A protein has these predicted regions:
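Class I S-adenosyl-L-methionine-dependent methyltransferase catalytic core
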Residues: 1-167
Length: 167
């Protein structure tokens, strides 16, 4: 386990497990509404063992605000390649991580990057050895009053695991 900016890691590993944030695939909801930093603020406080300034009814860390803690992995804008910035970031990470194998976890209904886009990108960066899909129940945002309907409610909810051998 490493506690630093993932793009600044300098180690070498046999296996790297990557579970990047994926924001929201719900086009009815601004992507900034679903940020990992907002959901994982408690864990960050435990790891840092600090006394952060809090805000809001939930008592979140000040540094988990949408405008402060945006993640490139959650960016739904188009990048210079004509692809989503999120897939560009995942590809950059895959290319930079010094590991013989990468196990990448991604969600079928959480992000705007598709399974096919990830498979294509991984195939261009090594040998895609296996893809697993694990079924999960939808989370409580499926019942949000504001949107009335989760964008992917008609599909199953799966967590994908991609095993890549880098060459």
């Amino acid at each position: 386990v490493c506690r630093s900016n993932v793009f600044d890691l300098h180690g070498e590993w046999d296996l790297a497990y990557l579970d990047p944030p994926y924001g929201s695939a719900n086009v009815k909801m601004p992507s900034s509404r679903v940020r990992y930093a907002a959901y994982y603020h408690l864990w960050k406080s435990v790891v840092l063992n600090d006394q952060p300034t809090l805000f809001g009814a939930a008592g979140r860390r000040e540094d988990s605000r949408d405008g402060i803690s945006a993640s490139v992995f959650e960016d739904f804008h188009m990048g210079t390649s004509g692809r989503l910035k999120a897939i560009e970031a995942i590809e950059r990470l895959v290319q930079q991580v010094k590991a013989r194998y990468i196990l990448l976890s991604y969600n079928s209904s959480g992000g705007r990057v598709t399974r096919e886009e990830i498979q294509q990108m991984l195939s261009e960066n090594g040998t895609l050895m296996d893809v697993m899909a694990v079924d999960y129940a939808h989370h409580n945002m499926a019942n949000m009053f504001r949107t009335r309907k989760w964008c992917c409610a008609d599909r199953g909810h799966q967590e994908y695991l991609f095993l890549l051998r880098k060459e």
